[in-house]
Each structure stands twice: as C-alpha cells, then as structure tokens.
Curated annotation (Swiss-Prot):
UniProt keywords, alphabetically: Hemagglutinin, Secreted, Virulence
Pfam families for this protein: Botulinum_HA-17
Primary location group: secreted
InterPro entries xref list: HA-17_C_botulinum (IPR008903), Ricin_B-like_lectins (IPR035992)
Protein name from the UniProt record: Hemagglutinin component HA-17 type D
Length: 146
C-alpha cells in the first residue's frame, strides 16, 4: 500500500456502508451507528485534510467541534479531543474506501470495521481493528460528496 495522500477534496460527505447500501453513519444521542438515510446534519461529515500530519479528520456537521476518533478498546466514537482522530482513506474503487488510522505505527494495519450481528449492522458499533481486507464489505465505505 502506498502512504501517499488519497485525493479527497475538503468538504461535507455522507458515509455509507457498502455492506448495506442504504445505511449511513449517523451520530445520535452520544453514539455512532448506521441508519437509513436522512437529510439531517447528524449524517453529514466534514472531511478536512490536515497537511501538517498528512492525514484526514472527520467532524460531524451537527457537532462541528467533535471528531471521529478511536479509544484504547478500538471503538470509534465522536470526541471533543483531536487525539487519535487522524485517518488515511485508502481508495479501492470509485468513491469506495477503507479508512485506516494514522496514529498507529503501520498505517495499513488498522481500519474501520462495522460490527455486524447476523448480517444486520443497524445500531452496531464501528471498530478500529487490525488486518484490513479489501474483500471484507464490513470495512468498505462509500464517501458521497454533498
């Protein structure tokens, strides 16, 4: 894998699961989950390239001072701290990405993974797990520019 910058323009996006084509990353009541699409700001994510770190940061449009980050247990959550909030979206197809962390020594080791419960990802956590796989639809996300 190349560590070169994936070209993604700064701006607002919706993050859709490839696993279930109609579900979008949503921030609601203090947690993240994948829900059916809506026009609400809690399903819109501001993507910003941070040149000093050579990584991207996602903030929620409804909560602009909070960033997608991961904790010591591997859960991805919305944090008011910018710690553990830099990501490297690796393009694998048109508008399709595996999103890896920049905060761990080997950039390509850890990636967003949607936990599924018997093929149902609704209300399931998003994890930052090792060993990403381009054939694992639970790790592939579509970024739809708004």
């Amino acid at each position: 894998m190349s560590s070169e910058r994936t070209f993604l323009p700064n701006g607002n996006y919706k993050i859709k699961s490839l696993f279930s084509d109609s579900l979008y990353l949503t921030y609601s009541s203090g947690s993240l989950s994948f829900l059916n699409t809506s026009s609400l700001d809690n399903q819109k994510w501001k993507l910003e390239y941070i040149s000093s770190s050579n990584g991207f940061r996602f903030s929620n449009v409804a909560e602009p001072n909070k960033y997608l980050a991961y904790n010591d247990y591997g859960f991805i959550y919305l944090s008011s701290s910018s710690n553990n909030s830099l990501w490297n979206p690796i393009k694998i197809a048109i508008n399709s990405y595996i999103i890896c962390t920049l905060s761990i020594v080997n950039v390509t080791d850890y990636a967003w993974t949607i936990y599924d419960n018997n093929n149902n990802i609704t209300d399931q956590p998003i994890l930052n797990l090792p060993n990403f796989d381009i054939n694992n639809s639970n790790q592939i996300l579509k970024l739809e520019k708004l």
